[in-house]
Amino acid sequence: LLVALAEEIMMRGYILGRLLHTRMNKFLSLFVSALLFALLHLFNPNLAFLPMLNLLLAGMFIGASYLYTRNLCFPISLHLFWNWIQGPILGYQVSGNDFGTSLLTLHLPEENVLNGGAFGFEGSLICTVLMIVLTILIVWWGEKREAISLAVPQSC
């Protein structure tokens, strides 16, 4: 779980934070940092196209949580919770890596694209849909929040 902490400090705290201080569009900055996050997992066991896409989408989701709060606590918490639920609680592989003993034991009838196969939940179509929906919700919330703060008159 310390890996999640290190990844968030590096990917969101440093890389996305620096990109947001350039003239680059915030969504392009978010995409670039998410792509680097996905590439960070390039040599994980059992990586294929769908898990790589989901890692990119997860990078967008977690990155958006930083983009709209500018607080590392939110993305770190999301990432830790995500990994903790998958591995130590449900017994899934986390990004292709086995966590060993878990609180619950999943008995999947077969490994396929619905359950993520050997890569774990992050290799599933369900994860793809979940990451897209969560990213849209974070961006919607963040844009709405920014619009409200811009509409409020500034005091002298």
Locate each region found by the language model.
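Hydrophobic alpha-helical transmembrane segments
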Residues: L2, E111-I132
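Membrane-embedded alpha-helical segments of multi-pass transporters/permeases
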Residues: L42, G87-G91, I136-W140
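Functionally important transmembrane alpha-helices
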Residues: P51-N112
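Membrane-interface capping segments at transmembrane-helix boundaries
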Residues: L137-V152
